[in-house]
Amino acid sequence: MELRKEMPLLARHEGQWVGVYTTVDAEGRIIDQHKSHLTCEFSNDSKFPYKQTNRYMWSDGRTEEHFFPASYANKKIWFENERISGAAWEVDSDTVFLTWKRNDIANSKLVEMIQLSSDGLRRSRTWHWFVNDALVKRTLIEETKVV
């Protein structure tokens, strides 16, 4: 199985992405904003053919880095690690959809849409955060491919 062939849109996301994450509360007020640098890569590892590293940088000097290896089955990539559990799949030729839970937030569900530009150099992402089935915040992400 060649993941790039099975999920051609996901393959177009391979590379380095820089951007800004803006999180708003349920009423639309900005509650967080930070820069990001994501690495999306494919490998010959049969257990985890997709790997993603997210690096976050805040203006006050804080940083975070998270590694997300993903398995593949049934036309979806599956994340299962200490931080998240969930899956991503292609909806059409330019939209990827994800649902997952944050393992450190009880009764959480996140729903994400990733929209890739036709030239493959920009993407817009939105996360809807639910806790106990109630919307608690949204994260809006704008990114540019740099490599």
Model-identified regions with their sequence ranges:
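General beta-strand recognition
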Residues: 18, 49, 97, 122-124
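Alpha-helical interaction segments
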Residues: 6-8, 68, 79, 117-119
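Amphipathic/hydrophobic helical signal segments and adjacent flexible N-terminal regions
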Residues: 1-65, 131-147
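Generic preference for well-ordered secondary structure
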Residues: 1, 24, 94, 98, ...
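Glycine-rich, aromatic-bearing surface loops/beta-hairpins
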Residues: 100-101, 106-147
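Surface-exposed coil/turn segments at beta-strand junctions on protein surfaces, enriched
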Residues: 10-12, 91, 118
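Central antiparallel beta-sheet cores of small beta-barrel/beta-sandwich binding domains
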Residues: 31-111
